[in-house]
Amino acid sequence: MWKLTRRLQPHINSTRWLVRNFRNGGAGDATGLYGFDHLKTAKGFQRFVADAIERSGELVSYISGMPSSPEIIKAMDEISDTVCCVVDSAELCRQTHPDREFVEEANKAAIEMNDYLHHLNTNHTLYAAVKKAEQDSNLLTKEASRTAHHLRMDFERGGIHLDPEKLDKVNNLTTNIFQLCREFSENIADDPGHVDIFPGSRIPRHLHHLLNPTYRSTSGGSRGSTRSAHKSKQKGFRINTDPRTVSSILQWTSDEEVRKMVYIQGNSVPHANHGVLEKLIAARHELSQMMGCNSYADIMVEPNLAKSPKVVTSFLQELSKTVKPKADEEFIAIRDFKREKCGNPSAELEPWDETYYTSMMKSSINDVDTAVVASYFPLPQCIEGLKVLVESLFGATFHTIPLAPGESWHPNVVKLSLHHPDEGDLGYLYLDLYSRKGKYPGCASFAIRGGRKISETEYQLPVIALVCNFSRACDSSIVKLNHSEVEVLFHEFGHALHSLLSRTDYQHFSGTRVALDLAEMPSNLFEYYAWDYRLLKRFARHYSTGETIPEKLVNSLQGARNMFAATEMQRQVFYALIDQMLFGEQPETARDVSHLVAELKRQHTSWNHVEGTHWYIRFSHLLNYGAGYYSYLYAKCFASTIWQSICEEDPLSLNTGTLLREKFFKHGGAKDPAELLTDLAGKEIISVHGEGIVPATTYLLNELRL
């Protein structure tokens, strides 16, 4: 049925379930997690699920009476809203809550709601009602008609039109795919791998706080991780090879053997995901066959701008061909730099060298000291920067508001309201930005509640959580961000704003619920602001002196920004091609995935493949972006065009913000994605390619000097 990355709304008494279960009360009004009254305790997830199923059942009964078409669509949207409030709250809790009981109950809730979704997705009464509504001219708005059409298509992509036996198989496959995706993610979290390095002096001192000490006998005895070390024991470090730690080691460690060991281990675990990925590929392919498609990629790409995997592959191959000469030049430059630094004119350049030497080249050529840069980006000042940006562009202000007892999941969580002087509150944003054990390891924007029109006088405001993992340096009580972290913060803020500024009638199209290959455009667009001195000078101040960041330093940062743009572009094209290969048409005989990945790397990058490494077994984008990773490259092209043609001349003006909001943000997914883009930036932003649409690459390639 509907995609349940989406949400819904009611007919009569539409606020009854919501008011009973959600509050935005002040600090004195006790509530539950995220403002949901049910979630005062972990066990409350059970009641949360039960009430959502009960409310959805009432709405299904109402729809079965075939009311007017507008009421059918409203009720369908409420079912989605009701279910998604539980699903999304459970996902956020699962990823961020420090209490294990809450995490376990959230897991159970997610599984139970997923099972219930299968029941809804195979409900022929709902399907018949949606078909009736779609054909009815009484749907008075384009958004209502578009919602009806999308709901019908979502039903059919779920197999509602199949005979009962096939539909049962589709449901079983869908459940299996859900479980495999969860297993893949859990394996990554549970088995990051590790490498023990002796002596500890081989690791730079400023990284020691990221690592656990370990000891061994100087005579070569057994190793242990206790601190009961005598003088006969040698201290080393156990490096957990999770992506964040691996990145730090590869950037800062001069010892090539250490980098090599960490690179290989970090790109070889978790071993269990080899089998999980094989099963996932097979299950998704079988699902596509049941649905009458050639591949899972066909299913996933068809609703998007690209329309066809052939269009995607053609776009990627053309991009690969365009950037290869420049990428080869960059590779030679890095290799020559390594040879000079290590005094070996025949030294070969290996993948574990890339981050170390490119960072060194950027710093030396552009006089950029990352520690100096970070001193101008204490986290509280970066939050001020987001506030300055929103006020400049949209005339809206963020205000810190008190959290009600029971609403928060950690003492570090902050809640903001986005307020407009003429429109009132636009939505709510939780900030959970500090690193802690057991928390989601990356940065992401999580929806908690989507926006939707409840009546002519009432609008359900969106609620979003922005989650990051910023940590203090070992010698500081202040969290200071390196510039890449500032860029990530602005990226995720772009996603959050997409939801907060959306004003759709139906939550089905609220905010980021757009075509997959358009969804990353706002986040990529807002990355540009992290580089623009016109904004940076208004918030980036030295953590101890208060000095504004020097323009010369920002110019140096910008000089380093695109030094290896072709290499990075190659990497993204390579990832996207792997994604298409894994979930594209499958041969009759089993494939050696590792061999195919190695071959694609040789064809589309300038770097060696390291035998025995399998980085893709921890590439979680294969789960939620399966056959859709190309969307990041689409988004980069769209964002570059929009930045240069609309924002760059006057990036902080209310006129620029009004154009972005009125032409793009407020519509969410309620308008055709191609129409959204051309209304904002003109027809040159896209071009028709075969049966689909591809982005214009001119602006991006010029920006990157490719």
UniProtKB/Swiss-Prot annotation:
Region (Disordered): 212-238
Record's keyword terms, sorted: Hydrolase, Metal-binding, Metalloprotease, Mitochondrion, Protease, Transit peptide, Zinc
Protein's cellular compartments: Mitochondrion
Binding-site residues, Zn(2+): 491, 495, 520
Cofactor section: Zn(2+)
E.C. designation(s): 3.4.24.-
A GO CC term attached to the entry: chloroplast thylakoid membrane
Active site: 492
Gene3D superfamilies per UniProt: Collagenase (Catalytic Domain), Neurolysin, domain 3
Biased composition (Low complexity): 214-227
Co-factor binding comment: Binds 1 zinc ion.
Effect of deleting the gene: No visible phenotype.
GO biological process, one term: proteolysis
Pfam families for the chain: Peptidase_M3
Function: Aminopeptidase which cleaves preproteins, imported into the mitochondrion, to their mature size. Could cleave both preproteins and preprotein intermediates already cleaved by the mitochondrial processing peptidase (MPP).
Protein name: Mitochondrial intermediate peptidase, mitochondrial
Gene: OCT1
